[in-house]
């Protein structure tokens, strides 16, 4: 019966496998995946045996075996550790190890896949082991691989050793994350001897190239074993000599020989291993001795080329600094690969990052940077890797793709595959070094000055590039030298007559450099001169239709406006209008979201810095068209995706955002929304404000919109600014906005704090009649949220909304608020620590303080008494008073303390029944305490009493409402002061 069931299961699995392998029906594939998961959970051993049988069958097509491996790997990732018994794990691990080592020459991709199965099984199996020993599963794999590798080495079987090294490489790659218990280090230690034995098969450079595959996997294993797992000084010296032998032949292989490519690839891995040693073992590098890095007699030598023949026994050439400088100084492409140069550059950068923590490393670097090698080395880095491409083809890109050309000046410093990026990192590390800054700066300035004097376009762009990125590391406290360079050399080049005669490549770098060094220009006169020059560049570039120069000049202008030295007196009279006209023209022409984001950022900075104050409504019209274009584009794409996708399935926002630079587009939309908000703060038209509701706010906050998932936080921020900046509630759109925000309060999503702030702000804007828009059901839900939410931000926002309801209520909602507040306070088990109690106490205080007379206060008191009585017998009126007194001890401000004291007084005065003497005495002492200290805060605020007394009442009110960032000129600020005036007295 069991065998029959197993057979049925295998047949079912085969059918599911075929669907997953070949079907293009998405629904069918999902159903098959779900059924397979169910079978795997119920009968994991049957699944493992069935897939193993297929993978082990040499009669099955290789692609089918490969597909089965993929299924097994997915199962191992999800279920191996918990769903498969230990005995079964051990059996299948042993089976797969035997399979790997038994098959002589499997297809390389299949061999890699099966070896990954072995690695995952060992990694995800039981990790229990004796102290200092490897887990049994891992030990078994290591022992099997090492034994097989030693047999292949002894037999000098290159083919067999190559396969075993492949298996070992995959295993080491998977194990390198197993650092707990030093598992990875233990695996690497077991590999030291067998790997050393394999190196004996390759005694010469010729042997390495002839046995390229063997050597490649040997280097890959060495990368993890010696570069990341085990520090072995003897190996480091041996491997350096081997690397020199490879480098010595660069550029000497016949053009049609495969050896050239083989040599470069092996050199890349060798350099990667040397780099890893520095990164993983910086504190042990002293064990290598200084001669490993730099030799004393190198000072008089010139920088060699990697293509220069060298003897393996020529000791001076065996220092690693000479090797790396030789690689860096060789022609890229013709002699060395870009990847090899990047790794050589990163080796130096990694050493420099460790110099502060290791005196030996610092000493090695000092020796090198003070040697005769260093200055030519640094000059080559600047001239070869920091120069712009200045060919006619490059210039044609200025008109074809101007936005990409302008953006290309901002190099990705994290790109480890770009020589320019790696050269920038090393240049900055050298000139910013603790131990080597002196000689590095001297060499850097000498190099750039020489390149500038050459006068050729390429070298000049390289020099300007180096100076530009060195705005921090090359700057000094005495800025007179740079200012002289700025006044005497740079600014004259920005004159329109000179620009017309200057290479566009040089002009672009000059404009860029001026912006990069903005922090070194501190005087108003100089800053004004620079901004005037940049304005002139803008006018010239617009006239000559040089979009690249326009974009670079705008970026440099932004640098000056955004830096800490900026003042309004820096701004030339016409600069702002020139910038706005230029931005407006560009926004209608550019296509790159990154460019739009940059332009929006510039205007945003101008607004935030105060350079634009009275043009808010005009700025809205500047940013609205591109914002609408992005929104319309995403709505259209969502509609198309929905039309072509499977029926009944919603559009995946991630898929839309990832397609065709979508995330970048939405990033620019976020910036445009911020700019719209900044503009509204300086506008004065309610019509302009509420015109954004249907075309921007609704499509960017609707749960069904394609853009919402990406921009809703900025959209709700903009919505809040709209409400704060509006002056009246007369616009029909304002009423629509309030209803829309109220509907969103019923959702459970991350924007709720902003939603409630919008509701609170709009209720204050509406001023009265809260009952017309807010229902008792709304209030019930808000009270529940306030009591149950763990988010302080959400509690603050909900509290502000309830304050607004209480202040604008005609009576019924205010009474309901008082009832809820009184009940919650009476029933609180720890009134001082629960975050909702203080807001609810202030709801009571505000309601009584806002009452127009004694009769209205008496009516509220009736509701409070009824609420307390509904809590009987656990809650009493006396307990309510006690809870309020306890809250005084944790009051956050003088304003709150005084409000609570007045609340206690009115509750005592309006009590339906005479209070006990103890209660009266308790309240009296609390009120006297508030009066004696001016209502100062308790120590929980972190401020002393004197500081608390000095705080202005409006400041404390804004803090209570969560409106600390509201400027005094905002219409919302004035409304808050009027609405809550009762708390200010």
Role assignments for model-derived ranges:
Residues 2-985:
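Karyopherin-beta/Importin-beta family HEAT-repeat alpha-solenoid scaffold
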């Amino acid at each position: 019966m069991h065998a029959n069931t197993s057979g049925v299961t295998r047949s079912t699995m085969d059918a599911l496998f075929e669907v997953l392998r070949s079907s293009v029906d998405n629904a069918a594939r999902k159903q098959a995946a779900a059924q397979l998961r169910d079978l795997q959970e119920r009968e994991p051993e049957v699944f493992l045996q069935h897939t193993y049988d297929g993978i082990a069958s040499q009669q099955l097509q290789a692609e089918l075996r490969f597909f089965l491996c993929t299924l097994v790997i997915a199962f191992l990732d999800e279920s191996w550790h918990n769903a498969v018994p230990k005995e079964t794990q051990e059996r299948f691990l042993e089976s797969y190890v035997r399979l790997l080592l038994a098959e002589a020459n499997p297809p390389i991709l299949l061999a890699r896949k099966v070896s990954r199965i072995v690695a995952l099984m060992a990694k995800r199996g039981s990790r229990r082991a004796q102290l200092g020993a490897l887990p049994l599963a891992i030990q078994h794999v290591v022992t099997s691989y090492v034994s097989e590798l030693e047999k292949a080495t002894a037999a000098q079987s290159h083919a067999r050793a190559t396969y075993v090294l492949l298996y070992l490489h995959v295993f080491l790659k998977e194990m390198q994350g197993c650092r707990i218990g030093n598992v990875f280090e233990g695996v690497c230690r077991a590999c030291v001897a067998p790997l050393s034995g394999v190196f004996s098969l390759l005694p010469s450079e010729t042997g390495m190239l002839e046995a390229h595959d063997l050597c490649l996997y040997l280097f890959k294993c060495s990368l993890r074993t010696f570069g990341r797992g085990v520090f072995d000084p003897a190996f480091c010296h041996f491997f350096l000599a081997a690397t020199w032998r490879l480098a010595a032949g660069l550029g000497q292989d016949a053009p049609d020989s495969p050896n050239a490519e083989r040599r470069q690839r092996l050199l890349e891995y060798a350099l990667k291993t040397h780099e890893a040693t520095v990164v993983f073992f910086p504190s042990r590098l002293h064990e290598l001795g200084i001669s490993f890095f730099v030799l004393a007699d190198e000072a008089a030598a010139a920088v060699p080329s990697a293509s220069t023949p060298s003897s393996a026994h020529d000791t001076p050439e065996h220092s690693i600094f000479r090797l790396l400088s030789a690689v860096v100084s060789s022609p890229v492409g013709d002699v060395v690969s870009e990847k090899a140069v990047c790794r050589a550059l990163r080796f130096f950068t990694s050493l420099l990052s460790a110099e502060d923590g290791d005196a030996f490393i610092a000493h090695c670097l000092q020796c090198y940077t003070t040697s005769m090698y260093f200055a030519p080395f640094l000059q080559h880095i600047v001239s070869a890797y920091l120069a712009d491409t200045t060919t006619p083809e490059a210039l044609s890109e200025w008109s074809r793709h101007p936005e990409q050309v302008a953006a290309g000046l901002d190099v990705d410093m994290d790109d480890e595959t770009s020589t320019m990026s790696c050269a920038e990192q090393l240049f900055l590390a050298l000139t910013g070094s603790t131990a080597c800054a002196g000689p590095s700066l001297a060499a850097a300035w000498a190099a750039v000055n020489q390149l500038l004097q050459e006068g050729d376009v390429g070298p000049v762009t390289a020099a300007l590039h180096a100076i530009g990125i060195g705005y921090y590391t090359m700057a000094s406290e005495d800025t007179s030298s740079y200012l002289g360079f700025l006044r005497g050399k740079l600014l004259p080049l920005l004159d329109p007559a000179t620009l017309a005669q200057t290479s566009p490549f040089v002009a672009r770098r000059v404009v860029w450099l001026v912006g990069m060094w903005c922090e070194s220009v501190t005087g108003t006169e100089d800053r004004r001169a620079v901004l005037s020059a940049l304005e002139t560049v803008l006018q010239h570039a617009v006239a000559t239709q040089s979009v690249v120069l326009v974009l670079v000049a705008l970026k440099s202008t932004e640098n000056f406006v955004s830096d800490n030295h900026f003042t309004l007196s820096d701004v030339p009279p016409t600069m702002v209008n020139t910038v706005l006209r230029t931005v407006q023209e560009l926004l209608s022409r550019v296509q790159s979201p990154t460019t739009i984001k940059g332009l929006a950022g510039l205007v945003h900075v101008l607004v935030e810095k105060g350079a634009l104050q009275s043009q808010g409504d005009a700025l809205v019209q500047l940013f609205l068209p591109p914002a609408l274009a992005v929104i319309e584009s995403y709505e259209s794409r969502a509609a198309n995706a929905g039309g072509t996708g499977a029926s009944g399935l919603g559009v995946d926002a991630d898929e839309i955002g990832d397609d065709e630079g979508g995330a970048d587009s939405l990033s620019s939309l976020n910036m445009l929304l911020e700019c719209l908000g900044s503009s509204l703060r300086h506008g004065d038209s309610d019509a302009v404000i509420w015109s954004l509701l249907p075309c921007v706010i609704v499509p960017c906050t609707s749960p069904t919109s394609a853009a919402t998932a990406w921009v809703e936080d900025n959209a709700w921020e903009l919505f809040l600014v709209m409400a704060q900046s509006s002056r009246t509630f007369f616009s029909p759109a304002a009423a629509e906005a309030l209803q829309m925000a109220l509907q969103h309060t019923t959702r459970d999503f991350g924007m709720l704090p902003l939603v409630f702030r919008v509701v609170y702000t709009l209720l204050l804007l509406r001023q009265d009649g809260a009952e017309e828009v807010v229902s008792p059901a709304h209030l019930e839900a808000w009270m529940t949220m306030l009591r149950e939410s763990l988010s302080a931000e959400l509690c603050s926002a909900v509290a502000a909304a309830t304050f607004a309801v209480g202040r604008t209520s005609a009576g019924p909602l205010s009474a309901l608020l008082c009832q809820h507040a009184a009940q919650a306070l009476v029933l609180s088990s720890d009134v001082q620590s629960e975050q909702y109690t203080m807001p609810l106490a202030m709801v009571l205080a505000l309601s009584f303080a806002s009452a127009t007379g004694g009769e209205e206060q008496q009516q509220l008191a009736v509701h409070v008494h009824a609420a307390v009585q509904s809590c009987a017998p656990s809650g009493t009126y006396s307990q309510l008073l006690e809870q309020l007194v306890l809250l005084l001890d944790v009051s956050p401000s003088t304003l709150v303390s005084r409000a609570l004291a007045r609340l206690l007084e009115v509750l005592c005065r309006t009590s339906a029944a005479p209070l006990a003497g103890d209660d009266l005495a308790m309240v009296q002492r609390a009120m006297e305490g508030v009066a004696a200290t001016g209502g100062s805060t308790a120590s929980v605020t972190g401020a002393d009493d004197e500081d608390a007394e000095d705080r202005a009442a409006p400041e404390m009110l804004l803090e209570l409402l969560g409106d600390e960032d509201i400027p005094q000129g905002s219409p919302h600020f004035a409304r808050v002061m009027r609405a809550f005036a009762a708390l200010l007295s």
